[in-house]
């Protein structure tokens, strides 16, 4: 399987981060070549502390911190800039999109689609 980056912009999502991380790692457990790239967009609710805990306990998890809120577009742009994997998937931190959809997205990439 090709390598995957999942970019997750975060703004004051401390309540959902551990569950999101748990679900993402479960979904991606069959592929050791992935990274979870959380971009903290100036959160003020302690999200960065939770993200740092997750990063310290899981080498697949990377964190970038913005010191003020620049917006989702800036967070995504930064994620795309630093990603080094074959496929890039974006996901909201609030679990609005089920992490299980990642496999469908990757399958579409493997069929030759550039944007899903």
Sequence positions of predicted segments:
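Structured catalytic core of nucleotide-sugar glycosyltransferases
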Residues: 1-116
């Amino acid at each position: 399987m090709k390598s995957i980056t999942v970019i997750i912009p975060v703004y004051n999502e401390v309540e959902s981060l551990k569950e999101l991380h748990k679900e993402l790692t479960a979904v991606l457990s069959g592929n050791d070549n992935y990274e979870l790239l959380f971009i903290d967009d100036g959160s003020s609710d302690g999200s960065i502390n939770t993200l740092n805990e997750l990063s310290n306990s899981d080498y697949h998890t990377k964190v970038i911190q913005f010191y003020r809120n620049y917006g989702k577009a800036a967070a995504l742009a930064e994620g795309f800039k630093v990603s080094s994997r074959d496929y890039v998937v974006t996901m909201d931190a609030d679990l609005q999109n089920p992490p299980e959809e990642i496999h469908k997205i990757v399958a579409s990439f493997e069929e030759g689609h550039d944007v899903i």
